[in-house]
Amino acid sequence: MEILNWQYGITYAILILTFLSSHEFGHYFAARYYGIQTTLPYYIPFPFPIALNFGTMGAVIRIKEPVTSKKALFDIGIAGPIAGFIVCCIFLIIGLETLPGKEYVYQIHPEYLQNGNGEIPMSGLYFGDTLLYSLFSKLFANPNGFLPPMNEIYHYPFLNVGWFGLFVTAMNLLPMGQLDGGHITYSIFGTKGHYAVSRAFFWLLLILGLLGAMYEWYLYLDETNATTILTGFGRSIYLFFQYFFAKFPILKGMWTGWLVWAILAKFVIRLKHPPVENEDDIGTTRKMLGIFALIMLLGSFSINAIYII
């Protein structure tokens, strides 16, 4: 089997392992600080050649004994996202500061020049834009240079891993169950406050996922000309979707995966957080860090995540 662009693959592998390690070792060292026994990170490979494959299903550590205080829970929960977030920001800055010209894309896709006028197609696999990615693009990319569209950034290891790492960080910071964001939210607001926030985010993800599924169904009907055979109620639903997505174009392209996440959160991760033994207040400094965690979540979250046009 011929292997092309192996140097970019090695760069990507090193970067993604660096991100995963920084996140998991953030948890690890915070747990060890409190004398809590924990394993070293387990890295989960995913080598199967499917359409959407980042080469890994992430990494995990296993905490071998209960966390007994809110302060320890908060510190362990937030250490991983902060460490991973910093690494991803560095990756994005490096990637944007060292962007090659448009000819780099043409080397990978010579057909863009051969079959057209050099314009990059608007179709393909897109990575959803985020507040942080947009901000960094304005701050660090050459304003007179070439900024690759979001359906081409997988050719740029630093941008790709930076985006992917922020996406993973955002998912971990969702304030639900025993995700990192759940630990943080529980430590700040307690059982009732955490459960209220957790339910709100469950409904948010469910709605986003359903909107994504609705739009995909609408596109399928439109592209296959199935609307010509729809009658009665089915055609009424199609016409409603047509009006709805024309009226609110921002709702197009929602990630259907949020529906999967909502189901996992409800039935696997669970929305509630188990209580800890010591529920003493975590103090003002940690609550300020909790606000920073919210900023990380909002800056890294993408409602359409990964989608195809």
Set out the residue ranges of the language-model regions:
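Hydrophobic transmembrane alpha-helices and their immediate loop junctions
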Residues: M1-I309
